[in-house]
Design a protein with these regions (language model features):
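NTP/phosphate- and nucleic-acid-binding module
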Residues: 1-91, 98-635
Length: 635
């Protein structure tokens, strides 16, 4: 008998090693009909594969991300088959499913463009209608090599040659198209009905600029037209909201070839940064933090002791001072530890919550840089909490309460993932278990739903990752709460207990925004540049109808500035319509229009970005309402 264990803990017995598809059918007719793929002992597995005795098995349908991944993987093969029909002689490299679709890398004399997409999509639809079965074949290494050599598919030959000798080599055949692939795939091409080719880009073979440049066609696929239409809408909206474009339009920041990946913040961008830091400093005060600042450059000895030299060296920048090796800090933690150790701490000092807006530098490949989302230097709103083991759970709960406030003020919902021990980690199993359990107990006590993200913890400890959801429904990993019992061991971080003896402290790393730069990029796209009044770089724009109203406009601005309202006067000698359109492009929360009538009555005419024309008001009344809106941080 062969026994498998299902997700709900129940066991199912079979007389022989039936396929996963047959196993699903035996469990229930509904599952047999709807299952598309399975996980066997955590590995995504094709339903054609046989069950394994003692394995943990979980099935997935089109309602699951794993089901969509499988559809897109098959769609990449359908696209490749269509291209083979239309452009004979194309050599195929790799064609994986990715987060929002799939792609295929091609070597062809034909230069692909979007003009080819209609013909390719038409051929794909034809292949889908034929509902061609996908047949999985496992071949001996030599036979697989010879097959692709005979077909002239050089890249497939190289891929096989790179595989370990003991690796199982599988091919998927669909009609006249056969591809080297580990799977998983749909049963047939019939489900690949809703798709769209998106763009063409260049991609070096194996990502190495020394190799040949291939052509990469990006595409996407969904189970329904509604899902595809929604994806295309979000994508189009995201292009309008691109923080790189809006950053330039709103004069917030810039990048220069003299420093790729190193952002330059302009005066208006600095207002955004400072307002975000001011808000977190208020939270520091509310939740009992002190603030420090530590150096940007520290000795190699420190990074050897911390473990960063062994585990993070490829992401660091280095220099020499007085013939000694130094590194520009990629993380703030060792500096925080040195601060803690400047005095002998007592249990009465704990928990000690130490915050820092620390500038860190991490090396990123030039091709990976992406506006404020992927940079080489950024500010982390880091904090390190030093505590006893008994305080771990309560401190994690307090951090989560802080994040609830932090994200709530921006109208950002979030979900949480518990990221566990990665392969490249340090420390004993016992300490990892204690740390992971502390995070799990805290989040369960707080009643916050969470998912497990296996193997994605930091090298020194497990963590909770907070993924915020923006106005387009996209998620961004921002906050972290990382438990660390490793660095306190390495640095002998201790405190004097009630018994008068030294005890090892526990260290918790937390960052709410994560990267201040990245969070600003997220907010730009979340709000489409139309920031809430309290963080808007310019809160009101005074627009004189004609030049003779300019002095009155300046007096209104001066009065508002006295109440710490950020205000600008539009002094351009242009038409009123032009000046209003310009303020709209700048996405200013309030336009204040002053003409002869307003001068005569000592009033202002107010237009709200949110609520339209608010009519004539007295300046004191408008200022009072605006101050209230700013103070309450209306979103």
């Amino acid at each position: 008998m062969i026994t498998i264990r299902l997700k709900d803990g129940k066991e199912k017995e079979f007389e022989s090693a039936v396929s996963l598809a047959d196993a699903a059918k035996a469990i229930s007719n509904s599952l047999g009909k709807n299952a598309l793929v399975a996980k066997v002992n955590g590995e995504l597995t094709d339903l054609r594969d046989p069950i394994v005795d003692g394995a943990e098995v979980e099935f997935f349908t089109k309602e699951d991300p794993e089901g969509l991944f499988t559809l897109r993987h098959t769609a990449s093969h359908v696209m490749a088959q269509a291209i083979q029909h239309l452009f004979p002689g194309v050599k195929f490299a790799i064609g994986p499913a990715i987060d929002d679709g799939f792609y295929y890398d091609l070597d062809s004399d034909h230069v692909f463009s979007q003009e080819d997409f209609t013909a390719i999509e038409k051929e794909m639809s034809k292949i889908a209608k034929e509902n061609i079965p996908l047949v999985k074949k496992v071949l001996p290494r030599d036979e697989a090599l010879q097959y692709f050599k005979d077909k002239g598919q050089d890249y497939k030959v190289m891929l096989i040659e790179d595989l370990p000798e003991e690796e199982t080599i599988s091919l998927y055949e669909q009609g006249d198209f056969t591809d080297l692939c580990a799977g998983p795939h749909m049963k047939s091409t019939g489900k690949v009905k809703t798709f769209k080719l998106m763009t063409v880009a260049g991609a070096y073979w194996r990502g190495d600029s020394k190799n040949k440049m291939l052509q990469r066609i990006y595409a996407t696929a969904f189970f329904s037209k509604e899902d595809l239409d929604h994806y295309l809408f979000v994508r189009a909206e995201a292009e309008k909201r691109d923080h790189r474009k809006l950053g330039k339009q709103l004069d917030l920041f810039s990048f220069h070839e003299e420093g790729p990946g190193f952002p330059f913040f302009h005066p208006k961008g600095m207002i955004l940064r400072n307002k975000l830091m001011d808000y977190e400093r208020e939270l520091f005060k509310e939740f009992g933090y002190v603030e420090i600042m530590t150096p940007v450059i520290l000795s190699k000895k420190l990074w050897l002791q911390s473990g960063h030299w062994d585990h993070y060296k490829e992401n660091m920048y280095f220099t020499q001072i007085d013939d000694e090796d130094y590194a520009i800090k990629p993380m703030n933690c060792p500096g925080g530890i040195l601060f803690f150790k400047t005095q002998q701490r007592s249990y009465r000092d704990l928990p000690m919550r130490v915050g820092e807006f620390g500038l860190v530098h991490r090396h990123e490949l030039k091709g990976a840089l992406h506006g404020l989302f992927r940079v080489r230097c950024f500010t982390q709103d880091d904090a390190h909490i030093f505590m006893t083991q008994e305080q771990m759970k309560d401190e994690v709960i307090k951090c989560m309460a802080m994040y609830q406030k932090m994200y709530g003020v921006f109208g950002l919902e979030y979900h949480v993932e518990l990221s566990t021990r990665p392969e490249n980690s340090m420390g004993s199993d016992e300490l990892w278990e204690i740390s992971t359990n502390a995070l799990r107990e805290a989040i369960e006590t707080a009643g916050v739903p969470y998912q497990i993200n296996e193997g994605d913890g930091a090298f020194y400890g497990p963590k909770l990752d907070f993924h915020v959801q923006d106005s387009l429904g996209r998620t961004w990993q921002c906050g972290t709460i990382q438990m660390d019992m490793q660095l306190p061991e390495r640095f002998d971080v201790n405190y004097i207990g009630e018994d008068g003896e030294k005890h090892r402290a526990v260290m918790l790393h937390r960052a709410g925004y994560g990267s201040l730069e990245r969070f600003i990029g997220i907010l730009i796209e979340h709000y489409a540049g139309a920031f809430p009044t309290w963080i808007a770089p310019v809160q009101a724009k005074i627009i004189p109808v004609t030049d003779k109203n300019l002095e009155y406009a300046k007096s209104v601005a001066a009065a508002m500035s006295e109440s710490d309202i950020r205000v600008e006067v539009e002094e351009a000698n242009e038409t009123l319509g032009y000046k209003i359109r310009k303020a709209q492009m700048e996405k200013v929360p309030y336009m204040i229009i002053v003409g002869d009538q307003e001068m005569k009555g000592h009033t202002i005419s107010v237009r709200s970005r949110k609520n339209g024309d608010l009519g004539s008001q007295s300046l004191p009344m408008f200022v009072a309402n605006l101050i209230r809106e700013i103070k309450e941080r209306e979103n």
